[in-house]
Amino acid sequence: MLPCYPRRPIGGFRVAYEYANRLVARGHEVAVVHPRRFASATPLLATSFYQRLRRQGARLRDVLFPPHVHWQPIDKQVRMLYVADLDASQVPDGDAVFATSWPTVEHVAGYPACKGKKFYLVQDFDPWLGPRERLQATWRLPFQKVTVSRWLYKQVVDAEGGPENVVNIPNGIDHERFHLTADMGQRPKQLVMFFRRESYKAPEDGALALEIAKRGHPGMSAAVLGQAYRKPPRVPPWASYLRRVSDDQLIAIYNSSSIFVGSSLAEGFALPPAEAMACGCAVVSTDCGGIREFAEPEVTALLSPPGDPEALARNILRLLDDDALRQRLAAAGHERIQSFTWERSTDQLEVFMRKQVGRG
């Protein structure tokens, strides 16, 4: 159960699709349900006239241009369902039903038993995603929980009061796509960073860190990736801005860059830096929680406190000024991330599902 239509690349959606692809390859029947009406805590009448107008426009767009996932390979055996909302009548019966975000949990909680054993794929936690109390309340519902990092696992276990119904299964990386195509030691001093408008991504902090680093190392360049049609004003004028790149383009950018920069305040796992590691980038990031699953300070990455662009810039400059350190971190990160595979994650998920569905 996803919270909305897949109009743009979203990390949590990619995780769901990766599992769906691999589960159908193992003989399971999988349907991925996308509601047109966004599953959120904000009712339509409580929003502004402009927001209501945008939603009406989105409905018309969905009628004229049916949704299609163009940014992620989907196995033909996966049933991609696009429905009006997450009412139980819109959802097929099954052995297991997975909520993938806290708003979807609130819908799935009321489903009858014929929809399947209830699971919750916990992918994020931060106050920017919704009311903290409601979010944490979903962790206490009688679902079987799957967290994507030890950081999230600890928070869910603390909220639930024990680990009985919680398992940690880290995300995988598709190494057939995200892999080295260029020597890590022969790369230009180019940085790559995402500029996403969500406040918890703290894009302004990342942009400021780039500006500070540029003053200390004028020869550096940067590729900033985003969704907006126009280059955001906070993106430095000297940086290139690339909108809605494909995976092939992203892999090429990673392989032509030396350093990946992450500025988030909180992340459940942080797929982009993990995928950048797989492509040979040294990672400089905020210590945003779930990134610790693969980012070990001074070993596979340089981490700084969230909300401190000056500290982020200092770590960028450390790598720009010390190529041996950059190459050491890039090599260690690349080696570390090889153990994160979707096959391993799917093995663990399949075992957990069979155990819980059989128990039910």
Where are these regions (language model features)?
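Membrane-proximal helix-turn-helix segments that form the acceptor-binding/catalytic region
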Residues: 84-93, 126-148, 152-155, 159
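Acidic anion/phosphate-binding donor-loop and adjacent secondary structure
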Residues: 127-134, 157-158, 165-187, 252
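Conserved donor-binding/catalytic core segment of Leloir-type glycosyltransferases
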Residues: 145-147, 182-201, 207-214
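Short acidic/histidine- and often glycine-rich active-site loop of Leloir-type glycosyltransferases
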Residues: 233, 288-298, 302-303
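Conserved acidic donor-binding segment of nucleotide-sugar-dependent glycosyltransferases
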Residues: 244, 297-298, 302-309, 318-323
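Aromatic "clamp/platform" in nucleotide-sugar-dependent glycosyltransferases that forms part
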Residues: 265
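Short hydrophobic beta-strand element within catalytic cores of glycosyltransferases
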Residues: 282-285
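A short, well-ordered alpha-helix in the C-terminal region of glycosyltransferases
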Residues: 311, 318, 325-339, 348-351, ...
